[in-house]
């Protein structure tokens, strides 16, 4: 029997609406041109599970599983159709990027893990953490925590000793801090100099030394900051030849006594005191004739005070410090680090700064107010770190060549600061490090003569560039520069005693000295004394033998034994063998009046020995005291 009713259209997936991932409903009628036309048997499109169960298999042909298998969590085995095959082909083409994506995810996870590990190490090793402005007021607790140490509320180490000291001061009424008046008054109040002279001294200090501690105006120096004020006057007094020696001596003793008390003050230390200590580290030898300060010890203790006092070491950039305060602290910190590294290498000692704090030095280069001088200090710090590592590597020095790879990389990195300008001392420091490494290697290598050309050549480079120093730049040169030049001259005395550069640099140092107590004068005397002793010993050796190199035999003799007693007065006429030392000096080095033009001499100045007179009637003086700076005791204003 044949059915005559209207045909029943089977319901299949092409008449159903599909809910896409974005939640909107799409009518299948609008997409029929993209669907296969005609009737498709359900068994051809159903999965293996639905065919076995003889149930409807509701699946999107672009999907990979039907709804039943998804709900039952079964593996859906769909038959391959032409459309699905084409779709799978495009899917597999896209799947080729999956491994690279997975590799990137694994790399990102590994990087995040390393960052988390480093952050944990920083938190554990850092003495302090960032502090918010709300913790700037002093707030004590039973654990002894306070905002003065720049601690974060999330990490406070226990400080029982600090707690006991604070409670002791509270219970017994003891003062925890000394004022400047408790330590020492200023030299004007003490009557050592009068106010007019102190004004001139401060002006001279600002002009030649203030840049080291970010002091650009005399108004920045107040008498209330006694240690800084006295130190500034002491530095300037070195270049006033007419100033009585007892006055300079009294200022020096006052500063030394104040430093001895300041160093034992409870931290934190004020900014002006750290500025004074930094200046004393730079000029520890030249400003004190009575009782020299050890720059290595002084810089080490000052660095410990700075670690507690400087906020930028304990906080992240952009904290409560103003840009000018941050720049001043960064500049002081870098200068202290440089003096510590200078003294460690020059004295054969260790460095008392942790690596993480030295790594803070380049931060100053990111500041908008950084100067080329700041960059030079950072370059010196990196240079001396390299030299110290090489100096303590015996294996490297035993087989050392004329060049070191680390120093060459440093030279390439800082080539823009290495100039032949006489005012720049960066080249002097590089050659000094090379000279020290070459001489150390020569002691360890059996064939020491192999490095002799490098040693003498480097010493000549140092002296040659130093002879180009302008007279107006000489006062600002730190003690370490004079040590470099003196060591280069002594090196030439060791190997080439007749080198004319020895006499030239000796005369040049004497010409720079405004007085007999100046460091350049003393180094010139030392070089002259060593040259004299070598000359005498060489003459004795040459008379007793016919050696081709008398100086080489003299080096093995006892040149500086106990038989040579200290002489309080040293006559330069005995030290200088000929006046040719001044013949090749750079023109323009006549007297100290060039530093302060417009002043006339009113006192007898320091005079060089007769040996340095270019003619019997013309003398070369070391300077003159400006009439406006003569103390009352010497001149009636």
Swiss-Prot record:
Coarse class of the protein's main subcellular location: nucleus
Source organism of the structure: Penicillium rubens (strain ATCC 28089 / DSM 1075 / NRRL 1951 / Wisconsin 54-1255) (Penicillium chrysogenum)
Protein family (similarity comment): Belongs to the prtT family.
One Pfam entry name: Zn_clus
Region (Disordered), start-end ranges: 127-153
SMART domains listed in its UniProt record: GAL4 (SM00066)
Subcellular location: Nucleus
Keyword 4Fe-4S: no
InterPro entries named in the record: prtT (IPR051089), Zn2-C6_fun-type_DNA-bd_sf (IPR036864), Zn2Cys6_DnaBD (IPR001138)
GO cellular component: nucleus
Bias kind Polar residues: ranges: 127-145
Entry function: Transcription factor required for protein utilization and degradation. Regulates transcription of major secreted proteases.
GO MF annotation list: DNA-binding transcription factor activity, RNA polymerase II-specific; transcription cis-regulatory region binding; zinc ion binding
Protein's UniProt name: Transcriptional activator of proteases prtT
Keywords from the named record: DNA-binding, Metal-binding, Nucleus, Transcription, Transcription regulation, Zinc
Keyword Zinc belongs to the record: yes
DNA-binding region residue numbers: 47-76
């Amino acid at each position: 029997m044949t059915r005559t009713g209207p045909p029943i259209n089977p319901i299949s997936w092409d008449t159903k609406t599909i809910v896409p991932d974005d939640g909107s409903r799409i009518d299948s009628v609008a997409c029929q041109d993209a669907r296969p036309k005609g009737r498709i048997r359900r068994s051809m499109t159903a999965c293996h599970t639905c065919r076995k169960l003889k149930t409807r298999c509701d699946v999107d042909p672009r999907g990979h599983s039907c709804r039943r298998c998804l709900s039952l969590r079964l593996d859906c085995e769909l038959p391959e159709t032409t459309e699905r095959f084409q779709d799978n082909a495009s899917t597999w083409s896209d799947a080729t990027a999956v491994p690279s994506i997975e590799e990137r995810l694994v790399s990102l996870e590994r990087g995040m893990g390393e960052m988390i590990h480093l952050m944990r190490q920083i938190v554990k090793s850092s003495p302090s953490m960032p502090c918010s402005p709300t913790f700037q007021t002093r707030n004590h607790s039973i654990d002894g925590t306070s905002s003065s140490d720049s601690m974060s509320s999330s990490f406070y180490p226990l400080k029982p000793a600090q707690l006991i000291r604070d409670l002791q001061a509270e219970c017994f009424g003891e003062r925890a801090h000394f004022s400047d008046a408790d330590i020492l008054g200023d030299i004007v109040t003490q009557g050592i100099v009068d106010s007019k002279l102190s004004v001139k001294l401060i002006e001279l200090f600002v002009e030649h030394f203030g840049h080291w501690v970010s002091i650009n105006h005399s108004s920045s120096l107040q008498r209330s900051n006694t240690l800084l004020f006295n130190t500034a006057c002491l530095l300037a007094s070195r270049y006033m030849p007419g100033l009585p020696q007892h006055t300079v001596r009294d200022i020096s003793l006052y500063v030394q006594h104040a430093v001895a008390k300041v160093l034992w003050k409870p931290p934190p230390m004020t900014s002006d005191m750290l500025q004074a200590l930094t200046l004393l580290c730079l000029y520890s030898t030249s400003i004190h004739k009575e009782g020299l300060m050890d720059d290595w010890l002084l810089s080490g203790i000052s660095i410990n005070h700075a670690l507690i006092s400087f906020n930028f070491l304990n906080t992240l950039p952009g904290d409560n410090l103003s840009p000018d305060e941050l720049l001043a602290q960064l500049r002081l910190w870098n200068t202290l680090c440089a003096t510590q590294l200078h003294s460690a290498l020059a004295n054969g000692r260790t460095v008392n700064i942790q690596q993480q704090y030295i790594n803070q030095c380049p931060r100053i280069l990111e500041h908008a107010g950084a100067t080329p001088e700041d960059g030079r200090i950072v370059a010196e710090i990196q240079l001396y770190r390299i030299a110290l590592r090489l100096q303590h590597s015996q294996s490297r020095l035993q087989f050392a060549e004329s060049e070191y790879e680390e120093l060459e990389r440093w030279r390439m990195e800082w080539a823009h600061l290495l100039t032949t300008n006489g005012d720049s001392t960066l080249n002097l420091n590089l050659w000094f490090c090379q000279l020290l490494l070459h001489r150390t290697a020569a002691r360890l290598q059996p064939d020491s003569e192999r490095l002799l050309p490098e040693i003498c050549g480097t010493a000549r480079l140092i002296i040659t560039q130093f002879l180009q120093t302008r007279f107006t730049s000489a006062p600002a040169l730190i003690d370490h520069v004079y040590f470099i030049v003196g060591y280069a001259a002594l090196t030439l005395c060791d190997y080439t005693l007749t080198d004319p550069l020895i006499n030239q640099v000796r005369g040049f140092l004497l010409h720079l000295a405004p007085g007999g107590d100046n460091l350049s004068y003393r180094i010139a005397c030392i070089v002259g004394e060593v040259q004299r002793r070598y000359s005498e010993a060489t003459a004795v050796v040459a008379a007793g033998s016919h050696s081709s190199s008398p100086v080489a035999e003299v080096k093995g003799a006892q040149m500086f034994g106990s038989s040579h007693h200290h002489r309080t007065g040293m006559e330069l006429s005995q030290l200088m063998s000929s006046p040719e030392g001044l013949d090749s000096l750079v023109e323009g080095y006549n007297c100290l009046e060039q530093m302060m033009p417009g002043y006339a001499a009113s006192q007898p100045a320091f005079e060089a020995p007769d040996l340095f007179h270019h003619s019997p009637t013309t003398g070369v003086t070391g300077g003159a005291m400006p009439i406006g700076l003569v103390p009352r005791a010497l001149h009636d204003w």
